Each structure stands twice: as structure tokens, then as C-alpha cells.
Amino acid sequence: MIKSILLCFFFLFPLLLTLFKKLLPSKWKLPPGPTGLPIIGNLHQLGRLLHSSFHKLSLEHGPVMLLRFGVVPMVVISSKEAAKQVLKSRDLETCSRPKLVANGLFTRNFKDIAFAQYGEDWREMKKLVGLELFNPKKHKFFRYIREEEGDLLVKKLSKSSQTQTLVDLRKAFFSFTAGIIFRVSFGQNFRECDFIDMDRLEELVQESETNVFSFAFTDFFPTGLGWLVDRISGQHSRIEKAFSKLTKFFQHVIDEELKIGQSQDHSNLVSSMLDMINRSTEYGSFKITSDHLIAMMTDIVLGGVNAGTITMIWTMTELTRHPRVMKKLREEIRATLGPNKERITEEDLEKVEYLKLVIKETFRLHPPGPFLLPRQVMSDIEIQGYHIPKNAHIKISTYAIGRDPKCWTNPEEFNPERFANTSINYKGQHYELLPFGAGRRSCPGMTLGITILELGLLNILYYFDWSLPNGMTIKDIDMEEDGALTIAKKVPLELIPTLPASLCIK
């Protein structure tokens, strides 16, 4: 594909070369980076997995590396020191987002909080979502939903345990995670909906995520040229098609909420925002509209469902590959919680310390997103002695930082004990572990995300032993990665659950 693009752009070489020269004056001390080609910059040096390509390049060129995507300078951060400088010391100057085509389309011209540019509207929307979805009172109120979904997960797995059949853990975890997030946020149980089922919902989430983070030439090349290439290549059509499907789904959700007259207590986000729309409520500097609602629903679908599902799968993959860790964790869980526990509750989450270490280690090796969402520099700044020009994009590689030997001993080894007796956590104060980001653009759904993750894993590890299919050994587990925003395990993890003789499910 790159070769065909080069042919399309070749006749514009003199013009674009001039643009490059004007974009980054030579008097500045810019970050090092690989030499790019005219017109396309470094695009030809990127493989299928962007995080892996960036990591390899950073090992050669350093933790603050400059690439060029077309005419856009892209700074890649691969060390905790540089990440701290961006996210703490220079947070205000770097906390905006680039206006990328697919992001803007899916969020109704950036009326959300994940992709919106920094400003008053973004601040007010973040406050609103904090009050209506992620405040401690709401989190406590929705506890019953999370525990009910945990019960459903166990009951479903127990059927496979009785017949000793393989379980595709992606489907099991997706149903659990989506069940919680959609009931909490949208007020609807999609197992009972007539307009979609879980399999179609999973396909919709995957397609939406792939397209909202897909490469659009319009984002990195002069407007007319990028626009033309996106249409010739079919990229524009693919993005529009995925957007249309997701919008249609959201409209079904909204119609269902309107049909039942909305929740009287407006406990879920959709009901609460519909009430504000109907009352023409002014929130801060703007009025809440249906576009704000659709944009926030997009954030929830893209930011919540896949990330939790994928992290649970990687955790179970690493536990299966490391029997010592699995045995230690299982013994701690069952010894701490005792035999014949009828159900796992959220009080139990604070009792299993080793599980928290295991999750931290999974975050280190398999962060939910290998990069934090891209930032755009709002004014010229300096990072680690290098000049970063205004409007440059910054990508912070949590993947590379998690494998940095300057931060971690034997970084490729899965070893939860490395977090024992340390204060390192994932709440944004420790820049070697950033699954939820840090600073102004940190993830507002962190508490909900962690609760879902811990609850799902605790349920399946308390009630079941897990084994590979007959004839398969831990050396046969495929660790190949795939994905865009989140990096999933490409080959499904299929295991057999067994209910221990000492436990029973009522």
C-alpha cells in the first residue's frame, strides 16, 4: 500500500519537501529519530503492530524519538522520566488532543471527553460524567449489578465444567464486562434485547474500535491530497460504514430508554443525559445535546469493554503459562475466602493481595492500550532537553516503559513478586506503570475498570481450576498480538474449567 501511495504523491515532492523544511527549523535541538522518506516520512518503517515498531525504533534512537507521519511530527516517549515530564511538568501544555478524522466523526465533532480538545467544554463534560457515572455514590449503588454479573459468569462456566468442554475466555469475559458496563451506563441488559445479541455486540465493538483508530491520510497530509487518497483507497467508506452501524445501535438504546419512560432516579448515564436534554439544561458553558450523549456512549463502548476483557485474558494467559504463580494465587484466594462460599462479593476484593500483584504485572507486560491516547502540544516545550514544537503529536508508549530494563529487573519475565513491598500503583503517580494514564487526561473510569477486572478474575479463580486441552502444553500457548487501541491475544485462549471437589456452586 505504501508503494502505491508513493507513486500518487511523487509529483508533489517539491511542495511537500518545502513544507517539511518550514515545519521544523534546523536551529532547534530536535529529538533523534530514523531518517524518513520525502512525503511519507517514517510511515514505511512501521509494521502491522505499531507499538512493536515504535519499541524497536526507540531502542535504537532513544526514549524521546521524533518520527514524521506525512507532514505531522510525532514524538514517541518510551521512558518513565520523559513520561513524567510530559504528564506532570508539562501536562497543561500537552493535554489537548489532535483533531483526527475518525475520532471526530465517531464523537460528533469531539463532544466527548476522551478525544475532545482541551478547553472549557471538555472540562465541563468531564465534571458532568464524573457526577453522573463515576462518582463514589454511583459506584456503590451499582455494586449489585457487578455482583449479579459475576454470578452469571460462574453459572455459565459451571455448565462447561460439568461437561468438561473448552471455554473461549474472550467470549466469557466480554459477556461479563459488557453486561456490567452497559447495564450501569445505558440501563439495559443486552441479553434481553431484541435488536442485538452478545455475538453481534462483540463484532460491533471490534469494528468500531478498529475504525476509530485506523490510519486516515487526511490526518497527516495536506487536506485535499489526504482526502483524495482516503476515498480512492476506500478508507473513508470503511470509517463511515462503521460509524453508521454504531450510531444505529446507539439510537436503539436511546429509543428503548425513551420507551420505558427513562429511569425515575436517572441512575444511568443515558437516562440522566436525556433528562438534561429534555429540560434544555445548561451545563457550564454549553447545553447538553443528543450529540454529547452519542459521543459519551462512544467513549464508554470504546474505552471500557475491550480493555477489561483483554486484560483478563492476558492475566489468565500468563497464569496458565506460569503454574507456580497460578498455584500460589489460587491457594491464597481459597485459603483467604474459605470453602463453599456461595458468592463472591466486593468486600472480598480487599482480602486477596497477591491477585493485586498479578494484575499489576499484567498491566506492566500487557497494558490495556500500548500507548496512551495521543496528545497534541499547544505551545513549544522542551522534554529531556529536546525541543518539541507546537502542534506536534505525542505518543507515550506504556508498552515500552513496561519493558524498560532501567525500570524493571528481567523485564520480559512475568513475576508478580516484583511489586511486593513497593508503593508502585496504577493511579497515575508512578510513571513506570500507566495503564490508566496520568494528569488531566487520565481515565475517569479507573475505579470501575479495576473493580470489574478484580471481580471477574476472583470469581473464576475461586470456583474453578483451569487446564489446557489434552495434548497441549504451556509451550504451545500462542502469544501473538493483534489490535489497534487495545492489543489483544490474536489466538483465542481456550481452557477447560473444573470445579474442585472441595467447592460447590449453589
From Swiss-Prot:
Family that this chain belongs to: Belongs to the cytochrome P450 family.
Protein name: Cytochrome P450 71B8
Residues that hold heme according to the record: C443
UniProt-listed PROSITE patterns: CYTOCHROME_P450
Keywords: Heme, Iron, Membrane, Metal-binding, Monooxygenase, Oxidoreductase, Transmembrane, Transmembrane helix
Predominant place of localization: membrane
Pfam families: p450 (PF00067)
GO cellular component terms given for this protein: membrane
Location within or outside the cell: Membrane
EC number: 1.14.-.-
Transmembrane segments: 5-25
The keyword Ribonucleoprotein belongs to this UniProt entry's keyword annotation: no
Record PANTHER family: CYTOCHROME P450 71B11-RELATED, CYTOCHROME P450 71B31-RELATED
